[in-house]
């Protein structure tokens, strides 16, 4: 009986010691992960329950991919793939887009050239992006990168969030227009017709968002944090568009799409917004306004004052978005540093 009593006392003493240890541990970490989750930015749609941009698990492995060397390697890989695909298609009898015919004053010649360009791109683009995505996944694995294949939160289908993103994309296009006019024009190699529409509005958003945001942004974020992931993916997205005006435009759009992806935790919304942006571009091409600025269009109708108002509002939206990006990245960096210190 005495032995049973002594064992019970020993067990109770151990239990009390364990409870004290747990209590002291909780007191050392007064803020939970949920408390550190940033609130939704002003003007954005209401956030879904639970944090959507919490820092990575501090116990997660340290990844080697991607570095800035990897960025150069991936861009080089993309160029090589494009050249190989073009060479194979030429051997198969395909015709490269003819710049002279595309810009011909003869409408019949131009229409045939645009149809041929659309047909060539319709085969070249999916082959190029399919190979690029596959080889990037292999390269990422060999280099020791995070293996996530994107995030697909249903919040990305929130209509209010989508409308906010569309407004932001449209405003950004207006703000960038004067700067892009200082750079050489982007050649019109896209073509016309249903093939060009399907390629730019469906294929390109799906493939490029999966590669740039789903694979590269997540991998870079796992390695160096949200700011690194955002910058890395936007740079790659910009550089692979090659032409100076397209590079600048794609880089800025890449920053915005990356920010929205981080905030929403969803590829759905960035694919939709990318498709919306490309659809606007295709609409302008189809209507014959490919090289006409909004300023020129509105000035021709005596609406210079209205353009000033539109540009001012767009600039305000753009600056607010930039502030939101900066605040979100700063907050995430604090969380990532806190997680690293707690490791």
Tell where the protein language model's regions lie, with residue ranges:
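Membrane-interface helix/loop boundary segments of multi-pass membrane proteins
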Residues: 207-232, 259-266
